[in-house]
Amino acid sequence: MSVTKSARSPQVATPLNLDLPESAKKLQSQDPSPANGSSSESSKKTKGITGFQTLVHLVKGNMGTGILGLPLAVKNAGILMGPLSLLVMGLIACHCMHILVRCAQRFCHRLNKPFMDYGDTVMHGLAFSPNAWLQNHAHWGRRVVSFFLIVTQLGFCCVYIVFLADNLKQVVEAVNSTTISCHKNETVVLTPTMDSRLYMLSFLPVLGLLVFVRNLRVLTIFSLLANISMLVSLVIIAQYIIQEIPDASQLPLVASWKTYPLFFGTAIFSFESIGVVLPLENKMKDARGFPTILSLGMSIITTLYIAIGALGYLRFGDDIKASITLNLPNCWLYQSVKLLYVVGILCTYALQFYVPAEIIIPLAVSQVSKRWALPVDLSIRLALVCLTCMLAILIPRLDLVLSLVGSVSSSALALIIPPLLEVVTYYGEGISPLTVTKDALISILGFMGFVVGTYQALDELIKSGNSPALSNSTMFIQ
């Protein structure tokens, strides 16, 4: 069949005959994605988000509650090994995102499509692979990726609800003992109030209104507000940390190998934003600048992670707690950190919700008439919000259950699938042995994250089953 392949000059396109696998021909004819215009023609859109808006969303997609647990993670790795490992993980995560974008752009050119999401890219990668079995089961690639994305992103939404309720509850319960003066290096909870589940329900109306925002350009306002509130809170934390940095000579450069898996499991999921990469690229006015924005955004995030993780461990040493906010004095300045994070996470919910909504809602809307499209759209959004709130309320130790599920889905999405996708995408064009080796090593690293995270979550679930019920904890979930 004949498709259009862009030449070096953007004004010239030459026809190229490709011998496509039979399964690829079927997928191309059945795929519901728009096919009018090539990727180069659609790279500039009259309506879309700007480069700055894309950067804001990208930074917000990465910067969640996980950064508060990184000082403890650095403790489990060592004051030298921890920051170095964070740097390596940031580079690998960024590289895998670039792989996904390149493969998606490759199939856009090859199949003359304006855009592709994560699931479509994997599906076409399998369809063009040299293996007949993979070609015949290419549709399962899209289904598996969509399932992982839905589970991961809605899982984050569930944990965000728990985080919102717990932090607001801590501030309210400590209000009688919170002072203006910041001397005591401790956050205490003295006055019991209503159950945290009632706090969760109190956020439901606000979250319901937020998810009704369906435009990424409008969501930029909320992402920008979230970034500002979180950055201000991190500045407050940082200025307290650097006031009194003790001698670091007593801290181990490299911690015990027995505790390093705890660092690995915490850190690897802090870089989880691959689910929003292609939706952001697809919505850009000029997608050609996306790789630069992606590198800039991940550089900002990695630098923040290393700074907070290393400085937090340097300041508090072995006394560092699971969330660095628990090491702050019980005064209004540092209690405001929790309130700022509540605002930030509240705004972040809508962005994390955007990905599963874009997968589920179009499938449902396609089954009804145009008259009912909007009511069905809004109803599904409201139902999904209620579902995340219900799961947050009903499931004991939700953080461990989601860590178990995330160990599989997050590792697969961020580290296992992208390098394997690169191999099957470029295999027929003579991919170098060095690239294959690099991709294999990254996939092995992702599989290690899956094994370590699964073991850690199962171990904690077993321990929690033999102890009194504990409140949900969110410091290890991004």
From Swiss-Prot:
Can you list the GO cellular component terms from the UniProt entry?
A: endoplasmic reticulum membrane; plasma membrane; recycling endosome membrane
The free-text tissue note of the record is: Expressed in spinal cord, brain, testis, lung, heart, colon, spleen, kidney and muscle. Found in neuronal cell bodies in the anterior horn, in spinal cord brain stem, cerebellum, hippocampus, hypothalamus, rhinencephalon, cerebral cortex, and olfactory bulb in the brain. Also expressed in bone and fat tissues.
The entry's keywords? Cell membrane, Endoplasmic reticulum, Endosome, Membrane, Transmembrane, Transmembrane helix
Region labeled Disordered — which residues? 1-46
Q: Where in the cell is it found?
A: Cell membrane; Endoplasmic reticulum membrane; Recycling endosome membrane
Which ranges of this chain reside in the Cytoplasmic compartment per its record? 1-53, 98-143, 214-217, 281-292, 362-374, 421-441
* Spans traversing the lipid bilayer: 54-74, 77-97, 144-164, 193-213, 218-238, 260-280, 293-313, 341-361, 375-395, 400-420, 442-462
Any one GO MF annotation of this record: glycine transmembrane transporter activity
Instruction: Report the record's Gene Ontology biological process terms.
Output: glycine transport; L-alanine transport; proline transport; proton transmembrane transport
* Name of the protein: Proton-coupled amino acid transporter 2
The species this protein was found in = Mus musculus (Mouse)
In the UniProt record, the gene name given for this protein reads Slc36a2
